[in-house]
């Protein structure tokens, strides 16, 4: 496929999302760069059949998998319990594969109850255990705290495989948006024991979150008020990713790619107005450059998590990817 990276006009403007301490998810007035699809598969799933809600065979809610502390903000040092929801198959003849789901939320929230719920329910219906986890976000921690949370969640899953009837040796990581970012960063830095990883419209280089957008939006992402800046430096630091790029690059999964990662699947809408489409491309291309295995889908005319991201077509691609790399 040819490289189509010329400027385009996508002039639908959405309001910024503002969280605690003024942490802001800046949205563009327009998308000015057309996605490079030269190493990706372009699909149009917007008007295809949608997933239907599914009732889990069994689901345990609000399990405390970690007793932690708030490490940033005005409540620093106070107790913070982190929870997990897990859908599982207690009566399956043999243990199922296990999917660890890391929810998105712009680094300012992580909702384990609703984030990507249709996809999780339908993965569970296809005989997977699916565990969704909370983690530190802006206002109660830093990005590196979240990496520790993921490690602790994985340890919890390792220690409870018999209780929930899954095979921990068949661990899959799935995340969307901010959760996609952590799917990439954690898996690339800690590949041992992970069979494959699925990153849906996730961030990567936090100095380039707005690189595909109008200049005002791009520059706003570099300021102290952006959620990514507060996540790296702290909500009261007054520093932006544009002030200390060296420190920001420590949080960039691209910089840790070796080519020895588990297989990756990326999916990203070409009209995403929260996370520049090029963010997943950076990781995908680096993995390919290093000789690793990565597949990337670009969803035509789809915004952030919308359109084809709750389609049966998407689910089928995910199921095939898992089957090809786990079973």
Predicted regions and their residues:
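Hydrolase active-site cap/lid region
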Residues: 185-242
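Alpha/beta-hydrolase active-site loop
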Residues: 142-162
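C-terminal catalytic histidine-bearing segment of alpha/beta-hydrolase fold enzymes
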Residues: 267, 274-277, 281-327
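Short beta-strand/loop motif that positions the catalytic acidic residue
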Residues: 260, 265-268, 272
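Short amphipathic alpha-helix adjacent to the substrate-entry channel of hydrolases
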Residues: 113-131
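Gly/Ser-rich "nucleophile elbow"/oxyanion-hole loop immediately N-terminal to the catalytic nucleophile
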Residues: 158-176
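Short beta-strand element of the alpha/beta-hydrolase
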Residues: 95-105
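N-terminal cap/lid segment of alpha/beta-hydrolase-fold proteins
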Residues: 34-93
């Amino acid at each position: 496929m040819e490289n189509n990276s010329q400027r385009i006009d996508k002039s639908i403007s959405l309001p910024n999302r503002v969280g605690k301490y003024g942490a802001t998810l800046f949205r563009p007035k327009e998308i000015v760069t057309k996605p490079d699809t030269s190493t990706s598969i372009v699909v149009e799933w917007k008007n295809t059949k949608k997933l239907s809600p599914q009732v889990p065979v069994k689901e345990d809610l609000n399990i405390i998998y970690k007793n932690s502390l708030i490490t940033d903000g005005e409540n620093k040092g106070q107790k913070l319990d982190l929870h997990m929801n897990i859908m599982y198959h207690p009566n399956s003849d043999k243990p199922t594969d296990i999917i660890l789901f890391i929810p998105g939320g712009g680094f300012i929230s992580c909702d384990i109850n609703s984030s990507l719920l249709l996809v999780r329910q339908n993965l569970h219906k296809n005989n997977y255990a699916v565990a969704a986890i909370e983690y530190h976000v802006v206002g109660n921690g830093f990005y590196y705290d979240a990496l520790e949370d993921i490690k602790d969640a994985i340890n919890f899953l390792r220690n409870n495989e018999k209780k929930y009837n899954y095979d921990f040796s068949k661990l899959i990581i799935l995340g969307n948006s901010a959760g996609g970012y952590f799917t990439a960063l954690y898996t690339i830095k800690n590949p041992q024991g992970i069979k494959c990883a699925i990153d849906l419209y996730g961030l990567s280089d936090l100095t380039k979150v707005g690189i595909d957008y109008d200049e005002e939006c791009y520059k706003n992402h570099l300021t102290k008020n952006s959620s990514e800046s507060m996540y790296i430096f702290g909500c009261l630091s007054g520093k932006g990713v544009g002030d200390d790029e060296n420190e920001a690059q420590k949080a960039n999964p691209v910089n840790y790619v070796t080519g020895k990662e588990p297989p990756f699947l990326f999916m990203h809408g070409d009209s995403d107005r929260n996370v520049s489409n090029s963010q997943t491309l950076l990781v995908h291309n680096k993995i390919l450059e290093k000789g690793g295995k990565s597949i990337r889908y670009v969803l035509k005319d789809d915004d952030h998590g919308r359109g084809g991201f709750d389609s049966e077509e998407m689910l089928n691609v995910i199921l095939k990817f898992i089957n090809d790399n786990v079973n």
